Amino acid sequence: MGKNISLWDHCDPQNHAPQIVAVKLSAKGERSVRQHHPWIFDQNILKTNKTPKAGDVGIIFAYKSNKVIGLGLMDPKSPIAIKMIHFDGGAEINEAFFLDLFKKAIEKRVPLIDKTNAMRLVFGENDGLPGLIVDQYDAVLVVKIYSLMWLPYMALIKEVLLSLCAPKSIVLRANRHVSRALKLEEEDQVVLIYGSLPNPEIEFHEYGVRFLAHVLKGHKTGFFLDHRNNRHRVGQLSHGKRVLDVFAYAGGFGVHALANGAKQVTSIDISAQALSLAEKNAALNEFTGKHETLCGDAFDLLQQQIKKGIQYDVVVIDPPSFANSADGVDLALNKYETLTRLGTQLVAKKGWLILASCSSRVDMDQFLQAHKKGFTAVKTQDFNLIEKTGHDIDHAVGFEHGHYLKTAYYRRK
C-alpha cells in the first residue's frame, strides 16, 4: 500500500496555481463589499468569467461599472462562496501582501506579550484572513485552516510566519469540513510542516499560571485561548474560596483558582481524559488547596451536588457550544436556562455565579434572558449582574458576525 496523502501534500502549489476570476455581484452583494463585510454568499454572485476553483482570486467589479471594488478568495463548495481579503480597489496577492496582513495582525497582540507566551496571532476574518487561524504556544505555531481556499497559499504563508515569528516548529491542522473534503485519514489531518516536535505537549503561561497544550490532539489548536482574561478574573476572585468549575476540560478556570490560593476546587467534565489533563495542569503550579475531579454528565452531577446541599463561593459554568446551527438556538437557550437554575442553587451567600457561552448564534441579550428565566424558575432575586465580558485583544472582532464568546458575572446578595 502507498503512503497516505497528508494535509501538507495538498498544499503543494503545483496542485492548483490560483487563477484570476472576474466576478459581478448583485446589488446586495456589492453593498456588502462596500461595507467591508468579509463574506459573499453564493446567491449574491451574478456571474463569473470562468468556473472558479478553491483558492482562485476573485476580482470583484462594481455592479454598474468596471471599477474594481475588492478581492476575495473563491470557495465554491461553501455557501460563503467568496471570502474577502482586500477592499477598495485591487492588489497583487503575493508574499508581500500576506506579509503586510500578518505583520499588522501580530502588532495588535503586542500588549499581551508581558502577560502570556500563548496567544492567537491571526483570527480569521477579524484580521483580514477569513478561515485562517494562527495560534502561538511559546515557540510553536499552530496554523488551522477552515477552508480549502487556503491550500494553494500555505507554502507562502509558512515562509511569512518563519520571517515574522522565527518559530522552532509549525503545525498545520485542518477543521472537520476541510478534512472531509480532502478525505483525509485522522492521522493526516495534522502535520508538522517545520522544525521538530519531540513533545507535542507544549508548556505555556498566562498571568503566571502554567498550562500544557497538546498541539497535535488538543481541542481547537491545543487550548482555549479565548477565555484567558476570564480565567485570570476567576483566579482573582478565588483566594481562600471553594470553587466549582463545570465543563472544566483542561481545568483552565480551576487551575487559575488553585494557583491563586483557592481552598478547594471541584472540576466537572464528562471526559476522564480531560480531567486527567486538568490534574496535570494543576500539578505544574504551586498550590495548597484541594483539587477534586468528578467525571460524568454535568447536568446530573449538578443535581447530585444540590441534593447533597453542597455550596461554593465561586461557580463557573462554561459549556461547549449548544447551537451549531440556527435550528439549535432554542435548545441551547433552554440548556443555558437549566444551567442557570442549577448553578444558582450551588452558590453560597456573597458568592459568584459565572456563566459563559461560546455560541455565535446566541447573542448576549438572548444569553442574559435565559439567565433571567433560570433565576425566575427558582424564585430568586438574589443575583445581581456585576460584569459582562467578551473577547480579549487577540480575539478582537472586526465584523458583526464575529462575536461568539460572552461571559456574565453574577454576585449573590
Regions found by a protein language model. Give the residues of each.
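Non-catalytic accessory regions of SAM-dependent methyltransferases
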Residues: 1-138
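Non-catalytic substrate-recognition/targeting regions of SAM-dependent transferases
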Residues: 122-135, 151-224, 232
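Conserved class I S-adenosyl-L-methionine
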Residues: 240-249
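Conserved SAM-binding loop of SAM-dependent methyltransferases across substrates and taxa
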Residues: 250-263
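Conserved SAM-binding motif I beta-strand of class I
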Residues: 264-269
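S-adenosyl-L-methionine
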Residues: 271-316
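S-adenosylmethionine
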Residues: 298-376
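C-terminal catalytic and target-recognition region of SAM-dependent MTase-like enzymes
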Residues: 338, 352-413
